[in-house]
């Protein structure tokens, strides 16, 4: 099983969704992320981190609110935002990093 650090330190573009099961905006992000994944396919990896289960990881990245999205490549944070992001905005934000 890959560890979180192995995944974000890879050369692949990785979008991390820090969420909580009780969070309504997080639930709204789920289908948006599925749609983004269906559009981008293997060009991006999307993983979800439940901050109630993995609080240490959330603390490491100073996650204060959920949902928080972070984009990584080679361990570097390329982009970060909190709150719900619609599909079009998320695709437009990710596009420059896909090359």
Please state what every model-predicted region is.
Residues 27-39:
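Typically the conserved alpha-helix immediately C-terminal to a functionally engaged Cys/Sec
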Residues 61-70:
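Structural micro-motif
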Residues 51-58:
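Structural microenvironment flanking redox-active thiols in thiol-disulfide oxidoreductases
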Residues 73-99:
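Non-catalytic, surface beta->alpha helical segment in thiol-disulfide oxidoreductase systems
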Residues 12, 19-22, 65:
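Short pre-active-site segment immediately N-terminal to redox-active cysteine/selenocysteine motifs
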Residues 20, 51, 74:
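Active-site loop/turn elements of alpha/beta-hydrolase fold enzymes
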Residues 1-13, 55:
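A short beta-strand-turn-helix
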Residues 15-16, 46, 69:
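Hydrophobic beta-strand anchors of alpha/beta hydrolase catalytic cores
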